[in-house]
Amino acid sequence: QKPFFLACGIYRPHMPWQVPRKYYDMYPLDKIQLPNVPEHDLDDIPPAGVRMAKPGGDHAKILKTENWRYAVQAYLASIAFADVQVGRVLDALDASPYANNTIVVLWGDHGWHLGEKKHWRKFSLWEEATRAPLMMVVPGVTQAGTKCDQAVDFMNIYPTLCELCELPRGEHLDGLSMVSLLKDPAQTWERPALTTHGRLNHAVRDNRYRLIRYQNGDEELYDHSQDPMEWKNLADDPQYAETKERLAKWFPAKNAPDAPHDASLGQGKKKKQQQGKGKSKKKSAQP
């Protein structure tokens, strides 16, 4: 009779990509398909975007060491491992008395580049880094196997849960309830998804376009109906001026300052190790 909330964080596919061998074996190296990365992909990217991508960093190292296929294999193996762990949680729920009155939300906090646009990790405003899974099961509301193609962002999760659980929603929240989409995935949704990486760097994504604007005003625009890999930057094309203006209205009117950084955090262990140096000449029996 008492409501409960359970948060279950599954660490993979976060680095390091170390999982049992059987998950690597699911993806033989000779079957791995590497991303298609045009040699001149970054030529039409503004300097701010290139700096964020850092093609001379991770991607250059991956190419030099010839580890691209190994990296993709390890990422896929980590996802397969995570999938099994999700299954364990859901199996336990299905076997419990709460299977038919528990809302399930499965989501990942960000995507990941595996060399697309000569970039690795997250840390960008492109599709690969900003698109992530979002799945919801609401007994009596959602239908199994349905898919919603609307672009939404994670600010909407909490307001959605508030409405579903009949809880008061704080007026300070920027997100919107997605209950209408859960009931009807084809429902009209006018608000595009907003992503921020670093202060004053934003991307707005609707069902067709992605508009990126960096802190210095540099822009990128991609038409996903024609260019799903974001290879052609349309930001300087005059015929898309109206599209840019429409999407730019969704950029934040205000930008909160960065959170204060406490330089002392994480220094305790290091300080303790430094203090312990030279106190004993006795060799440790441990490796």
Cite the ranges covered by each PLM segment:
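A long, amphipathic alpha-helix that forms part
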Residues: 60-102
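Core domains of carbohydrate- and sulfate-ester-processing enzymes
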Residues: 16-63, 272, 281-283
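Non-transmembrane alpha-helical segments in soluble domains
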Residues: 24-28, 76-79, 83, 87-94, ...
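C-terminal cap/loop subdomain of S1 sulfatases and analogous C-terminal strand-loop tails that border
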Residues: 110-116, 122, 142, 153-224, ...
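Active-site rim elements
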Residues: 64-77, 121, 141-152, 164-169, ...
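Short beta-strand segments
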Residues: 5-12, 103-108, 135-136, 193-196
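Histidine-centered active-site microenvironments of extracellular/periplasmic hydrolases
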Residues: 16-22, 26, 91-143, 150-153, ...
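Active-site regions of oxyanion-processing enzymes, predominantly non-cytosolic
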Residues: 1-39, 94-103, 242
